[in-house]
Amino acid sequence: MPHHIVIVEDEPVTQARLQSYFTQEGYTVSVTASGAGLREIMQNQSVDLILLDINLPDENGLMLTRALRERSTVGIILVTGRSDRIDRIVGLEMGADDYVTKPLELRELVVRVKNLLWRIDLARQAQPHTQDNCYRFAGYCLNVSRHTLERDGEPIKLTRAEYEMLVAFVTNPGEILSRERLLRMLSARRVENPDLRTVDVLIRRLRHKLSADLLVTQHGEGYFLAADVC
């Protein structure tokens, strides 16, 4: 079954261009010009990925990203203006998986979409070596069937990107993972100048949610998980 992409874009020409392009690429595509329209689509259909313009007429796209992350692990790629550097960083902090800037380069955008969908599918298929589908470390239980993290029975909310980065660490316990390798493991990007800041943001977010000393920085080399995994 084709992946379902929702394009949230209020500019008619851009919306039509994106819809045509991704339909030709073989995706199921829905379009809307508002956050309200997006919510209606998500209530009635299964959605794999959202292309979300942060400048919407009815609400702020960054606030919408945060609201989505509170109840969903759907893939989110923000569409921003070329000068909106702060918005891009805030968007990642609020749970977006990636971003692109206008004017859009469609070939790059489709690669980013394919790569995000690839890692979404990979995370869905991930299976641990334990019978109950959990990786256990330092009192935490990462369940790869339900895509959940718990400590002492208490759930810890993770965005999709946070979850996938944690999967990378628990499947490579004690191994130093460079920022470049983590970025490849997260998105397998094949575009020029991949944004390593994405890795830094995710590490900081995970450290805030986990014990701060679990993800250790090896200066000049990368990061590793300082815990036994079983």
Swiss-Prot record:
The modification 4-aspartylphosphate is found at residue 53. InterPro entries: CheY-like_superfamily, OmpR/PhoB-type_DNA-bd, Sig_transdc_resp-reg_receiver, WalR-like, WH-like_DNA-bd_sf. Residues 132-227 bind DNA. GO terms for biological process: regulation of DNA-templated transcription. Its main location: cytoplasm. GO terms for molecular function: phosphorelay response regulator activity; transcription cis-regulatory region binding. GO terms for cellular component: cytosol; protein-DNA complex. Keywords: Activator, Cytoplasm, DNA-binding, Phosphoprotein, Transcription, Transcription regulation, Two-component regulatory system. It is found in: Cytoplasm. Phosphorylated and dephosphorylated by TorS. CDD domains: REC_OmpR_ArcA_TorR-like, trans_reg_C. Residues 4-117 form the Response regulatory domain. SMART domains: REC, Trans_reg_C. NCBIfam families: PRK10766.1 (NF008034). Interacts with TorI. TorI binds to the effector domain of TorR. This interaction, which does not interfere with TorR DNA binding activity, probably prevents the recruitment of RNA polymerase to the torCAD promoter. Member of the two-component regulatory system TorS/TorR involved in the anaerobic utilization of trimethylamine-N-oxide (TMAO). Phosphorylated TorR activates the transcription of the torCAD operon by binding to four decameric boxes located in the torCAD promoter. Box1, 2 and 4 contain the DNA sequence 5'-CTGTTCATAT-3' and box3 contains the DNA sequence 5'-CCGTTCATCC-3'. Phosphorylated as well as unphosphorylated TorR negatively regulates its own expression by binding to box1 and 2. This is TorCAD operon transcriptional regulatory protein TorR. It comes from Escherichia coli (strain K12). The gene is torR.
